[in-house]
Amino acid sequence: KYDMSMLHRDAHETVERLGRGFPIVWLTGPRQSGKTTLARATRPDLAYVNLERPDERAFAQEDPRGFLATYPDGAILDEVQHVPDLASWLQADVDVRRQMGRWLLTGSQQPAIAQGVSQSLAGRVGRVELLPISGRELARAGSLPTSLDTLLFTGGFPALFDRDVSVHDWLGNYVATYVERDVRMLTAVRDLD
């Protein structure tokens, strides 16, 4: 197994570069592709806020101005798709204080947050899409599977390299969770059976 927190992702420099040119960087991509790990590795100087936590999410939803004021130097706002209305408040915040790279948002690409970011933050946000680990990234880390078949079957999700879990078990559960959570939300399907 390999410590994925030590893996240098190709998107690292892109996050840094966009942070010099935009007040907000939005790191998006599929679930479990390493967004949180990359955000924390790229910007260890920023406070970290996990909006999956019900208390943090409630604070951001109920008092967005107070929530953002809690982080005068900015923060990593992880799983920002849970508070899509925050985009308008971030717009107002960065229009007053134009410091570059102050906010680093992470979240899965979902229509609600994508629409909010596109409408409210145009010209204020640099977007980086983080895909699962590439063959080049694995080769650089010395973790490239020995056969192309293994690489294609395994894919590049970090959990498959740093956990003791079979590819079959992990991918089966990943797909099931995706269908149950994301597809239902996107299509408003009530019964997937």
Protein language model features and the residues they cover:
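Interdomain hinge/linker elements that couple catalytic modules in large macromolecular machines
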Residues: K1-S5, L131-D193
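Pre-Walker A adenine-sensing motif
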Residues: Y2-G19
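Hydrophobic anchor at the beta1->P-loop junction of P-loop NTPases
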Residues: L27
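Conserved lysine of the Walker
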Residues: K35-T36
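Short glycine-rich substrate-engagement loop in P-loop NTPases that contacts/grips substrate
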Residues: L46-L77
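Conserved catalytic/switch belt of AAA+ P-loop NTPases
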Residues: A87-P111, Q115-S120
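Short regulatory helix/loop adjacent to the ATP-binding pocket of P-loop NTPases
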Residues: P111-R127, R140-S143
